[in-house]
């Protein structure tokens, strides 16, 4: 009888332990396993499993491996289709977050850090409205101008078709006479080959890492920064123990910062590699940067006013933070 009781106790203990283990499905927009973005998400999944002693296990799926469009990732997380994700294309679901991507508003790493810290509480609330917990994120290097034609100043964009990833980038291209076109990353190579587009706004360590063979010119004019949000389904997150929640937040914060640092370092490596392979790289000049900033500043205001008082206040918060 004693053996039966003991066996029953062990079985119940095992069942209880299993009941507390959570298995999450994760998704990232990136389909390239060697990028800093995917490596960072992989480290998060590995560390979470180890540091929670298996209480939380995250299985990462790369872009295009699940039936989730890039623009729908935040919605998919909010709906519980996946529990965890990295989303670069969040702006359609959380448009106020686009404030960080306004052209010429944030010009360097220090300004980015100040702006993000100031606006983070607003972003947390905005994602919460989508049933999503904003845990952190990472940033790409500055988005510069890669083209199939020579560019040494912004005036050279006139009449050319440039791929952008947001309406805000599109406004920049329009301001200097170009035609902005929105395409998914998978469409870029064939579109460049066929002349559907003649350039892209991206980073050397971003899109240009895969598309450099089609883009012989890079004008190092920093239009804006691109960033990815690391998010979780609110219901799934709330179901975790307080200890696991804190551990997940801590790991995301550390690996998000590490991913940003990896991108910055890789930007230097890729620039050198691309130049060695024959890409013509032209530096921007301070006079043109000042001109573009002055030209785009009224757009920041109109963008905020068109979207409502909350956006006007958010813009003020960011501008006050960076002194601009």
What are the language-model segments listed below?
Residues 7-15:
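Bacterial N-terminal signal peptides
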Residues 22-111, 127-324:
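N-terminal secretory/targeting leader peptides
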Residues 15-21:
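Sec/Tat signal peptide C-region and signal peptidase I cleavage site
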Residues 1-6:
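Bacterial N-terminal signal peptides that target proteins for export
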């Amino acid at each position: 009888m004693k053996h039966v009781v003991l066996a029953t106790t062990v079985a119940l203990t095992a069942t209880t332990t299993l009941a507390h283990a959570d298995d999450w499905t994760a998704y990232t927009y990136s389909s390239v396993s060697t990028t800093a973005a995917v490596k960072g998400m992989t480290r998060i999944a590995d560390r979470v499993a180890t540091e929670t002693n298996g209480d939380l296990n995250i299985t990462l799926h790369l872009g295009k491996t699940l039936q989730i469009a890039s623009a729908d990732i935040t919605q998919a997380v909010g709906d519980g289709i996946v529990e965890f994700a990295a989303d670069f294309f969040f702006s359609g679901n959380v448009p106020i977050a686009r404030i960080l991507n306004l052209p010429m508003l944030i010009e360097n790493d220090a300004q980015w850090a100040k702006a993000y810290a100031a606006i983070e509480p607003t972003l947390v609330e905005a994602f919460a409205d989508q049933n999503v917990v904003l845990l952190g994120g990472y940033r790409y290097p500055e988005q510069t101008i890669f083209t199939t034609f020579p560019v040494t100043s912004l005036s050279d964009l006139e009449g050319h078709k440039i791929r952008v990833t947001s309406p805000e980038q599109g406004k920049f291209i329009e301001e200097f006479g170009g035609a902005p076109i929105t395409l998914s990353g998978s469409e870029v190579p064939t579109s460049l080959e066929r002349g559907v587009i003649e350039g892209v706004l991206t980073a050397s360590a971003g899109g240009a890492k895969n598309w450099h063979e089609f883009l012989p010119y890079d004008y190092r004019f920093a239009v804006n920064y691109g960033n990815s949000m690391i998010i979780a389904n609110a219901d799934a997150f709330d179901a975790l123990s307080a200890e696991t929640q804190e551990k997940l937040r801590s790991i995301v914060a550390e690996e998000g910062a590490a991913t940003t640092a990896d991108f910055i370092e890789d930007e230097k490596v890729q620039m050198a590699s691309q130049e060695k392979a024959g890409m013509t790289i032209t530096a921007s000049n301070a006079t043109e940067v000042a001109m573009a900033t002055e030209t785009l500043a009224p757009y920041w205001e109109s963008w905020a006013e068109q979207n409502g008082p909350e956006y006007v206040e958010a813009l003020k918060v960011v501008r006050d933070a960076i002194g601009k």
